[in-house]
Design a protein with these regions (language model features):
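N-terminal leader/targeting segments and the immediate start of mature chains
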Residues: 9-53, 60, 64-65, 189-203
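Short, solvent-exposed coil/turn segments at beta-strand boundaries
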Residues: 37, 59-67, 76-82, 123-124, ...
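Short glycine/serine/proline-enriched coil/turn segments at secondary-structure junctions
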Residues: 50-52, 75-76, 136-140
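An acidic-aromatic
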Residues: 58-105, 165-168
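Surface-exposed, polar helix/loop patches in the mature regions of secreted/periplasmic/lumenal proteins
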Residues: 83-138
Length: 203
């Protein structure tokens, strides 16, 4: 489910934005940098894709590196190779890290920050940042609402409308920084008895 946290934010300033929109974009970008910046981060998530699936797990980021753990699936990506373990089928599948086919949902969550209008509301101890896609936007995400802690700027929840369905993500145990590179090294010997499938492009 890593695609749910793969937003591509931008610090670009839109000349005709309102003050509220500029503030909303700054808040969103600050939190994005806490999650996806070079210092790395980790969080726990509980995802509900309405009418499709529910899943919870833990994820780590650091630059182009990524790792997650769920009840059935585990994955490690060191920025070059992506390794996914299916605990039920006892398989290890390898992909190039930049292959969009490594996750069947990933292509549905395309996001361009310039395709949205931003708006922020006061939610008491939180900021409520709403993103609405422009009518001519090509991305699949049409609406998004992020709940961000005012004091820590940590993400608390995210609600996304993709095409016709809604996805809700509750976030907890967020930490930014102090993420070791060793976390993203795939422990191949641990799964040596599994069936291995290599889907990397051959050179």
């Amino acid at each position: 489910m890593t695609m749910l946290f793969g937003f591509c934010a931008s610090s670009s300033v839109i000349a005709d934005e309102t003050q509220n929109a500029k503030q909303a974009r700054r808040i969103f970008n600050h939190t994005y940098d806490m999650v996806f910046g070079p210092q790395g981060s980790t969080l726990q998530y509980n995802v509900n894709i309405i009418g499709v699936m529910k899943v919870k797990g833990k994820i780590w980021y650091k630059g182009k590196k990524k790792r997650y753990e769920e009840s059935r699936y585990l994955s490690w990506s060191d920025g070059v190779k992506y390794s996914r373990v299916d605990m039920k089928k006892k398989t290890v599948t390898l992909f190039d890290a930049n292959n969009p086919n490594k996750d069947k949902y990933e292509s549905k969550f395309t996001f361009n920050p310039l395709d949205f209008d931003y708006y922020v509301e006061d939610g008491g101890s939180d900021f409520i940042v709403t993103l609405n896609a422009h009518k001519k936007a090509k991305c699949n995400i049409k609406h998004a609402k992020a709940i961000i802690d005012k004091k820590t700027r940590a993400p608390k929840s995210l609600k996304i409308k993709v095409l016709w369905f809604w996805t809700s993500i509750n976030i907890s145990h967020f930490k930014s920084g102090d993420i070791s590179d060793e976390l993203f090294t795939f422990p191949a010997t641990k799964y040596k008895d599994y069936t291995w499938i290599d889907n990397r492009l051959k050179k």
